[in-house]
Amino acid sequence: MTQIMTPKTIVHELERHIIGQNDAKKAVAIALRNRWRRMQLDNEMRQEVTPKNILMIGPTGVGKTEIARRLAKLADAPFIKVEATKFTEVGYVGKDVESIIRDLVETAVKMKREEAKEKVTEKAARLAEDRILDVLIPPARTSESKVGFANEPAEDAASKKEKENKTREIFRKKIQNGELDDKEIEIEVAVAPKTIGVMGPPGMEDMTSQLQDLFSSLSTDKKKNKKMRIKDAIKLAQDEEAAKLVNEEDIKARALEAVEQNGIVFLDEIDKVCRKSSNSGADVSREGVQRDLLPLVEGSTVSTKYGVIKTDHILFIASGAFHVAKPSDLIPELQGRLPIRVELKSLEIEDFVRILREPDCSILKQYIALMKTEGIDLSFEEDAIRKIAEIAYKVNEEVENIGARRLHTVMERLLEKISFDAPELVEKNINITTDYVNEKLGNLVKNKDLSQYIL
């Protein structure tokens, strides 16, 4: 997809979901386009060109995570978001940073497996239908004598076979049209191997995962007859047939390549593993996490159960609010590995208005769609939208700035009564006015103590 996506196109796509923050959008758009540019180079030059990792700096709720998440969807690339605070230095209790790459590979394998299954959907559907038809119309057997010669003429056998095929096609059409969905049949299905719980100490998740895989591989493939509706049986049989048709070794190879060439790791809360400049105490584990991240970000080799991964060309996007610590509190080596710095701005009232209205699945559109399921036509006046934005901004200023997430809290409080009474409401056209917003939220905003706990 990135082949035809210029940086301007990428920014335009991001603008459908994220309001403002143009500097951050441009930075990630250039990084994504550089992926494609690198793949056009000759092999020798391609190995030398490494991604320019990004450090996003900005308060919570301004779009840091959303930018990275949408970028991964646009790139159709393996993507993982991790909290830097979840990891500890090697030797301490907790997850070590190499598990980031192992989780990224797992994500890529699932992604490539789904892609492979999609390619064989039609064939798998046909085979699944055949399995159901074999239960509904068991294939006729030609009666044979003890010496192995057929007792009936060949013409009769051919006629029976033709009649059987016609019957099968009639039933196939009925299955495809959903006419037999609720009919129950007994079908042979594969039994999923039982998961064996392995107790392991904290931080040893990789070892316990490998032990579970070992026990699973030792269990033989068992099958059992199960009674279910045809609708469910078709889905189950289709999944089983698709799994047989795909090449697992090819999936693994393509997943490893996708991670190495296009993988994106989003490191959130990077500021929480900074050593505070004012703190003279021992922050061994925090600084240790940064030192462990260094080889990953710079380029190293990580062993996974699917194969070895080189992290040289994986794009790392780190982000943090940096309220207490500063970017300069990161260890110098890690600062050097995050050359592109982008500062995301705090949201203003106008930004809140746009967030409510403009994105493809904006908050207002979501609530309107939810109420539509109850037969209620919900609408908002322009002044009411601005008032909601002003309230969200004011509460952020006075209580705690949580960015755009404040809008969800405000909207839930505003529409609480309508949402609760929706099934019994006689009036199906509801228009939200400024007066209604003031009535529901006015007192809460004025009373700082109340807004602190409710909004």
Curated annotation (Swiss-Prot):
Supply the Pfam families for this chain.
AAA (PF00004), AAA_2 (PF07724)
Where are the disulfide bridges? Answer: none
Binding sites annotated in the UniProt record for ATP = I19, G61, V62, G63, K64, T65, E66, D268, E333, R405
Q: Does the keyword Mitochondrion apply?
A: no
Q: Does the keyword Flavoprotein apply?
A: no
* Superkingdom, natural source: Bacteria
GO CC annotation: what is one?
HslUV protease complex
Alphabetically ordered keywords of this record:
ATP-binding, Chaperone, Cytoplasm, Nucleotide-binding, Stress response
Annotated region (Disordered), positions in chain: 144-163
| A biological-process GO annotation | protein unfolding
What is the annotated signal peptide range for this record?
Answer: none
Compartments, record wording: Cytoplasm
Recorded GO molecular functions are: ATP binding; ATP hydrolysis activity; peptidase activity; proteasome-activating activity
Describe the function of this protein: ATPase subunit of a proteasome-like degradation complex; this subunit has chaperone activity. The binding of ATP and its subsequent hydrolysis by HslU are essential for unfolding of protein substrates subsequently hydrolyzed by HslV. HslU recognizes the N-terminal part of its protein substrates and unfolds these before they are guided to HslV for hydrolysis.
Q: How does it assemble?
A: A double ring-shaped homohexamer of HslV is capped on each side by a ring-shaped HslU homohexamer. The assembly of the HslU/HslV complex is dependent on binding of ATP.
Q: Which HAMAP family match?
A: HslU (MF_00249)
Family assignment from sequence similarity: Belongs to the ClpX chaperone family. HslU subfamily.
Protein name per UniProt: ATP-dependent protease ATPase subunit HslU
Q: Give the species.
A: Francisella tularensis subsp. tularensis (strain WY96-3418)
Lineage start: Bacteria, Pseudomonadati, Pseudomonadota, Gammaproteobacteria, Thiotrichales
Gene name, please? hslU
